Structure formats: structure tokens, C-alpha cells
């Protein structure tokens, strides 16, 4: 409320784990090839370039008042769909609609995408599946 009364534009951006996914083999992504066994192995991520473009989008398109936002890649770091992991953990829970956003990512960043017209560009899981990463990162 103070931000709005004072005519300020404040965007509090919550970022997940960020990495630059160096292509020199220093990052170990071998966990993407094995089954996910616990919820702790699921993780949201964001490539550092996408983080930079998110901040730029917020700076270039200010909105009045204060808003908090989640910003992340559209999927979780696992080689299995989050819906499968949730179904195994809670087999009696009713089936969720395929369009439910949380099936793709543990956090939802729809508000940031809508307000600023932003979308992440780097999908590390897709790059891994296409063997587009450095061999020591597979």
C-alpha cells in the first residue's frame, strides 16, 4: 500500500536455483537419467540468462504498487513428469486435469508472465534429452 500511495513500482521477484549451465562439463546432470525417488529430488530452476531477462522485463514495464512474483523454467529438474511423481506419492488422490499448471512445475509464475509478457528461453531438460549438452554433463 505504501508503494502505491507513493507512486512506486516494486516487483519482488522470487528466483529458484539458478545456474549458467556451463558447457565445459563442470555441472553434473547425471541425476536427470535416473528415477526420481523423493520430492526433494524435484527442483525448479532458471537459467541465468532467463533470470536476467526477467529482471529486464520488470524494469522496462513498471507496474504501480507492490507485487511479488515467482519466476522459473516451465518444468522441474527430473526426467519424469511431476504428475507421475505426485500420483505415486498419493495414489488415492483424484486425478488432476492435464491443464493444471502445477503438473509442469512446483511453483506457478503465470502472474509474472502475464504482467510482463515474459517467458524463459532456456530449457535444460530438453537440451539434456537432445544430447545438446557437453558430454560430461550427461
Annotate the PLM regions.
Residues 5-9, 20-36, 41, 49, ...:
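Glycine/proline-rich active-site loop of Rossmann-fold NAD(P)-dependent oxidoreductases
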Residues 43-49, 107, 122:
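Residue-level signal for the nucleotide or nucleotide-sugar donor/cofactor binding architecture
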Residues 16-21, 74:
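Proline-glycine-enriched beta-turn/loop adjacent to the NAD(P) cofactor-binding site
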Residues 52-109, 137:
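Mid/C-terminal beta-alpha module of Rossmann-like enzyme folds, strongest
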Residues 48-56, 125-128:
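Short, amphipathic alpha-helical "lid/cap" segments that border enzyme active or binding sites
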Amino acid at each position: 500500500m505504501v508503494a502505491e500511495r507513493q507512486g512506486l513500482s516494486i516487483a519482488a521477484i522470487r528466483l529458484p536455483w539458478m545456474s549458467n549451465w556451463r558447457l565445459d562439463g563442470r555441472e553434473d546432470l547425471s541425476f536427470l537419467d535416473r528415477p526420481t525417488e523423493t520430492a526433494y529430488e524435484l527442483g525448479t530452476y532458471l537459467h541465468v540468462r532467463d533470470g536476467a531477462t526477467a529482471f529486464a522485463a520488470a524494469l522496462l514495464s513498471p507496474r504501480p504498487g507492490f507485487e511479488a512474483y515467482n519466476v522459473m523454467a516451465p518444468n522441474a529438474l527430473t526426467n519424469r513428469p511431476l504428475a507421475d511423481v505426485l500420483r505415486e506419492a498419493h495414489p488415492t488422490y483424484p486425478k488432476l486435469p492435464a491443464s493444471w499448471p502445477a503438473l509442469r512445475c512446483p511453483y506457478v509464475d503465470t502472474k509474472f508472465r502475464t504482467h510482463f509478457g515474459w517467458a524463459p528461453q532456456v530449457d535444460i531438460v530438453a537440451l539434456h534429452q537432445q544430447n545438446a549438452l557437453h558430454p560430461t554433463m550427461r
